[in-house]
């Protein structure tokens, strides 16, 4: 790597001049990602066919081990005063894995080099050399043909053969192997029509076979005429997929036995054989569709954060919570459910759990919870059953589905609390089903992020049976800082979806504003610092803005959940003929971000769509 060309990396304050060559270790900035450790390499064959901008380099990314074209102004050398700063920009597991991967490469580059060669189909460094070899071969072949024409007084030797004729001759003259249905002609290099020569005498059987074959194959014989300087030896000379090659004899002494190998007196044909073999080997190894699919830049899934049963919230420890004597069932141990159950166990509540993936129940069993095989079993064992799943369909399946809550026909002395984010109609349907089985129903919508749940700082919006609300007081005090009872079933769902709409629209506005600042090359951190001093600030927007600036989209509130809430809001507004144009556009922005691969990332990942 030598200093000569100007280079800059987004987010950096210094610029230096560098020229990069293969095997140089670098930092590369790709759209939607923080600077990532990589290496300059020769492009794989499939990348050579892709359109790319000027002043780009092919970069191999450590960790994910894929390839991409990166502009030189988004590249920095790996070693430098900026290394320590860039290494601290992102902390996800994928980034740590990439750093470990490049350190491993520095110690032992063999394994990564082998993978690069395998991904490319042929060694990367040979790609340009192979192309030059093919180009030089074509040029030398043309020069050789011109030289041969000059040496023969302007006459180029042609080989003319009919596969059908040669097969007929071979069938009649197996005993006489010297018989060959070959016609030799000569063509002046500058003439339009071939010059005529007196043909050599042929055996009688060969002549009769030739006449019989020509009656039906005149056109195909004409199509099969080839010149030695036009078609590589061994190619399909008929121009048809299933045509067979006949034996050919070249005037000058070449026989059918040594023609394919190219006689020592024909360097042009021999060179053509080498080029043909090289092209065939490249085509066989390339597998372009598979390589293009595997080497596309991808969005990695966010790291699944395992529940830490030993962590304790300081806020929760300061609260004076007296656990209820009732047994609480919990259906669903997802991102929010697992955090809530952990806090309930910590505060001394008796909990029975169920989850579709039984492995997620194991940490809670070790902490003192009891696990059941089906939702119906949980209902039998518990007094009050909480449900917290990802969407309305899942919530209804747990109630009305096979082995669901309503499979236990008599829910007398049982209560069901729906904590999943659902629309009012779904909540009413579930409540009606519970009441028909003599049970009590409460909707308790939770508003907040995963971190707020861990800190016990959620907002609970409840509606339905007031007695159930009071019996759940100790649970709500454990997980929430404020609890509101809003009356009839459906009211809490409406309020929760309205709050989610405000949050989603605000996030899209923040993302677009920061994307504009980025286009102006204004530091996003400076924008966030100034925003913190204004009356517009809020803990939510400040936190999301910092995540956008860092490119850290570890899920606190998944983007797919936010888009789900917007969909429910728009359906609810449609039933009322309420116009919501801004919310509709916001929903489309979130849908597009999901399409880009950020469905399971945090809702702040909407910044990626606005920026790029």
From Swiss-Prot:
Gene Ontology CC annotations of this record: chromatin
Positions that bind NAD(+):
329-343, 421, 564
Compositionally biased intervals (Polar residues): 228-240
User: What are the PWWP domain coordinates in residue numbering?
Assistant: 22-81
Q: Where in the cell is it found?
A: Chromosome
Key words, A-Z: Chromosome, DNA-binding
Q: Which CDD domains does the record cross-reference, listed alphabetically?
A: PWWP_GLYR1
MF-aspect GO terms: DNA binding; NAD binding; NADP binding; nucleosome binding
InterPro entries given in the database record: 6-PGluconate_DH-like_C_sf, 6PGD_dom2, 6PGDH_NADP-bd, GLYR1_PWWP, HIBADH-like_NADP-bd, HIBADH-related_NP60_sf, NAD(P)-bd_dom_sf, PWWP_dom
- Region labeled Interaction with histone H3 — which residues? 276-279
> Which PROSITE patterns does the record cross-reference, listed alphabetically?
PWWP
**Keyword DNA-binding among record annotations:** yes
User: Which residue stretches belong to region Dehydrogenase domain?
Assistant: 319-612
Q: Which SUPFAM superfamilies match?
A: 6-phosphogluconate dehydrogenase C-terminal domain-like (SSF48179), NAD(P)-binding Rossmann-fold domains (SSF51735), Tudor/PWWP/MBT (SSF63748)
Mark out the compositionally biased spans (Low complexity): 177-193, 201-220
Q: Name one GO biological process term.
A: transcription elongation-coupled chromatin remodeling
Domain of life from the UniProt record: Eukaryota
The question of whether Heme is a record keyword is answered with no
- Gene3D superfamilies xref list: 2.30.30.140, N-(1-d-carboxylethyl)-l-norvaline Dehydrogenase, domain 2, NAD(P)-binding Rossmann-like Domain
Q: Where is this region: Disordered?
A: 168-270
Q: What is known of its domains?
A: The PWWP domain is a H3 reader and strongly binds DNA.
Chain's role: Nucleosome-destabilizing factor that is recruited to genes during transcriptional activation and colocalizes with a subset of trimethylated 'Lys-36' histone H3 (H3K36me3)-enriched regions. Binds DNA (in vitro). Facilitates Pol II transcription through nucleosomes. Facilitates male-specific lethal (MSL) histone acetyltransferase complex targeting to active genes on the X chromosome. Stimulates the acetylation of 'Lys-56' of nucleosomal histone H3 (H3K56ac) by nej.
Note the subunit structure: Binds to mononucleosomes. Interacts with male-specific lethal (MSL) histone acetyltransferase complex at least composed of mof, msl-1, msl-2 and msl-3.
Q: Which family does it belong to?
A: Belongs to the HIBADH-related family. NP60 subfamily.
What PANTHER family does the entry give?
CYTOKINE-LIKE NUCLEAR FACTOR N-PAC, OXIDOREDUCTASE GLYR1-RELATED
Report what the protein is called. Cytokine-like nuclear factor N-PAC
């Amino acid at each position: 790597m030598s200093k000569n060309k100007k280079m800059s990396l987004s987010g950096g304050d210094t610029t230096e001049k560098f020229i990069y060559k293969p095997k140089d270790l670098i930092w590369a900035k790709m759209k939607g990602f923080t600077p990532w450790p990589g290496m300059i390499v020769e492009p794989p064959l499939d990348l050579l066919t892709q359109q790319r901008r000027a002043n780009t380099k092919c970069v191999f990314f450590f960790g994910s081990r894929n390839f991409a074209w990166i502009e030189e102004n988004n590249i920095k050398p790996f070693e430098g005063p900026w290394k320590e700063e860039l290494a601290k920009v992102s902390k996800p597991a994928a980034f740590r894995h990439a750093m470990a991967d490049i350190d491993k490469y520095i110690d032992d580059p063999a394994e990564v080099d082998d993978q690069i060669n395998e991904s490319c189909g042929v060694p990367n460094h040979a790609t340009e050399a192979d192309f030059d070899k093919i180009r030089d071969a074509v040029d030398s072949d043309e020069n050789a043909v011109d030289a041969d024409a000059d040496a023969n007084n302007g006459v180029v030797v042609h080989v003319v053969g009919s596969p059908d004729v040669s097969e007929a001759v071979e069938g009649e003259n197996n005993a006489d192997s010297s018989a060959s249905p070959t016609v030799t002609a000569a063509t002046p290099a500058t003439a339009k029509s071939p010059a005529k020569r007196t043909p050599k005498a042929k055996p009688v059987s060969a002549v009769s076979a030739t006449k019989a074959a020509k009656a039906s194959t005149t056109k195909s014989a004409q199509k099969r005429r080839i010149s030695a300087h036009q078609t590589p030896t061994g190619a399909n000379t008929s121009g048809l997929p299933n045509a067979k090659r006949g034996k050919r004899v070249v005037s000058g002494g070449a026989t059918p036995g040594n023609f394919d190998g190219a006689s020592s007196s024909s360097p042009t044909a021999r060179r053509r054989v080498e080029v043909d073999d090289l092209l065939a080997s490249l085509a066989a190894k390339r597998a372009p569709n598979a390589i293009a699919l595997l080497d596309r830049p991808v969005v990695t899934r966010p790291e699944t954060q395992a529940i830490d049963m030993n962590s304790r919230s300081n806020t929760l420890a300061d609260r004076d919570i007296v656990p209820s004597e009732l047994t609480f069932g919990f259906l669903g141990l997802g991102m929010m459910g697992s955090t809530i159950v952990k806090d309930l166990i910590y505060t001394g509540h008796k909990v029975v759990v169920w989850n579709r993936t039984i492995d997620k129940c194991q940490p809670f069993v070790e902490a003192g919870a009891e696990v059941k095989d089906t939702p119906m079993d949980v209902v039998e064992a518990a007094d009050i059953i909480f449900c917290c799943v990802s969407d309305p369909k899942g919530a209804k399946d747990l109630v009305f589905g096979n082995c669901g809550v309503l499979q236990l026909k008599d829910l007398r002395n049982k209560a069901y609390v729906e904590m999943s984010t659902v629309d009012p109609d779904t909540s009413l349907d579930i409540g009606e089903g519970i009441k028909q089985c003599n049970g009590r129903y409460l909707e308790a919508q939770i508003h907040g992020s995963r971190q707020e749940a861990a800190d016990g700082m959620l907002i609970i919006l409840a509606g339905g049976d007031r007695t159930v609300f009071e019996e759940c007081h100790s649970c709500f005090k454990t997980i929430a800082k404020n609890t509101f009872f809003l009356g009839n079933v459906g009211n809490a769902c409406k309020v929760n979806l309205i709050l989610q709409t405000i949050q989603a629209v605000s996030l899209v506005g923040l993302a677009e504003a920061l994307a504009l600042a980025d286009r102006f090359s204004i530091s996003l951190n400076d924008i966030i610092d100034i925003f913190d001093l204004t009356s517009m600030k809020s803990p939510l927007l400040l936190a999301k803005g910092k995540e956008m600036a860092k490119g850290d989209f570890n899920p606190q509130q998944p983007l797919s959940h936010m888009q789900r809430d917007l969909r429910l809001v728009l359906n609810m507004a449609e039933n009322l003929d309420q116009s919501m144009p801004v919310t509709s556009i916001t929903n489309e922005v979130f849908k597009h971000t999901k399409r880009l691969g950020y469905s399971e990332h945090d809702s702040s990942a909407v910044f990626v769509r606005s920026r790029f």
